Amino acid sequence: MSLIKIDQKAYEYNLRHIAKKIGSFQRLICVFKDNAYGHGAKLLAPLAKNLGVSFVAVKSEEEAQEIEEFFENILILSHRPHGNENSRFIYALNDISQVKKYKQDIKIHLKIDTGMHRNGICVENLEHAIDLIRSSDLKLTGMFTHFASADEMDGSFFVQKENFQKAKKIVKKYFSNLLFHSHNSAALFRGKIPEDEYCRVGLVQFGYGDSNLKKVLSLYAHRLSQRILQKGQSIGYGGIFTAAKDMEVATYDLGYADGLFRYNGKGELVLGNGKVMLGKMSMDSFSCENSGEEICVFKDADIWADFFHTINYEILVKLNPNIQRVLV
C-alpha cells in the first residue's frame, strides 16, 4: 500500500525555529485545517502539544473534534452557525449577520477584513459590529485578520497591517485582554510580529516558505508488478510512452484516485528517486523504471507544483486521507 512518511524530527525542528522567531510556543497558533495540509492532524497533534503548543486552528467542528483532546484552545475558521455550537471551541465570526445565529455564551474571534475582501467585517463597520456583539450573549475573546499578499513585495501587506492596527485601537476601547493574530506563514519572516499578537502558522510548519526549514512529508508507493518492456512496446493508456530499447519497468500502487494530479504522459515528471514516470498515470497506479519494492514519489511538493503549474498547497492537501501516515 502507498505510504506517507512524516519526519518527526523535521517537524519538531521547524516548530522550534518558528517559536524562536515568534518568541515562545505560547504565542503560536498551529493551523491544522484540511488534515494539517494533508500531513495528518491526529498524527501531528501530540507532537505539537508536547512541544508546548496549546492553540490550533481548523476548518470545521468535525476537524476540531478529532484533535480536541490535545489542545486547550481550538479556533474553527470556516463555521456556518447553526445554534448548537460547542462551548469547548472558539468560532470565527466572519460576517456580522451571523451574530444572532450562534448559540449563547459561545466564544468568538472577530474576523476583520483589512483588504483581502474575502471574509470579515471591514474597519469602517467595526463600531457597529461591536455594538451588536456587546448586546448579544457571545463572548468576544479575540480578533484577527488574514494577509492577502504577504509573500509578494508590494504595498498591500503594509496597508493591511495598518488597517489591523486601526481595528485593534477601536476594539480596545470596549474590550480588554483580547487575543490578536494577523501574521500568517507568509508574513512570519517579514519583520517583527507585534508584541500583543499571536502568529498563525500553516504550511510553514511543514517546511515550506523558508530555506531554513525542513520538509516534513514524503510520499511513497509500493510495487505491484514488474516486467521487461521490449523495444517498440508501449505502456499504459493510449500508449503515450514507447520504449526505445529493452527496459525493466514496474507498476506502483499510487494514482490519481489517491489525490495526485493526473500525469498525462507529456513532459518529464521526475520522481523522488530521480526516475521519471512512464506513460499516463492510471486511477490507482503509475509506471516507471523498476526501482525496487518501494519508491519515493516526492519529498518536496514544490517539484510537482512546478510541473503542474499550481501551488504546493494544492499538491499536499489533495493527498487522500486514507493513505497511511506514519512517523519516522
UniProtKB/Swiss-Prot annotation:
GO biological process annotation, one example: peptidoglycan biosynthetic process
Q: Locate the active site.
A: 33, 237
Give the CC-aspect GO terms.
Answer: cytosol
Annotated metabolic or biological route of this protein:
Amino-acid biosynthesis; D-alanine biosynthesis; D-alanine from L-alanine: step 1/1
What Gene Ontology molecular function terms does this protein carry?
Answer: alanine racemase activity; pyridoxal phosphate binding
For the modification N6-(pyridoxal phosphate)lysine, the affected residues are: 33
Identify which cofactors the protein needs according to its UniProt entry. Answer: pyridoxal 5'-phosphate
**Which NCBIfam families does this one have?**
alr (TIGR00492), PRK00053.2-2 (NF000791)
Name the UniProt record assigns to this protein: Alanine racemase
Organism from which the protein derives: Campylobacter jejuni subsp. jejuni serotype O:23/36 (strain 81-176)
The primary gene name is alr
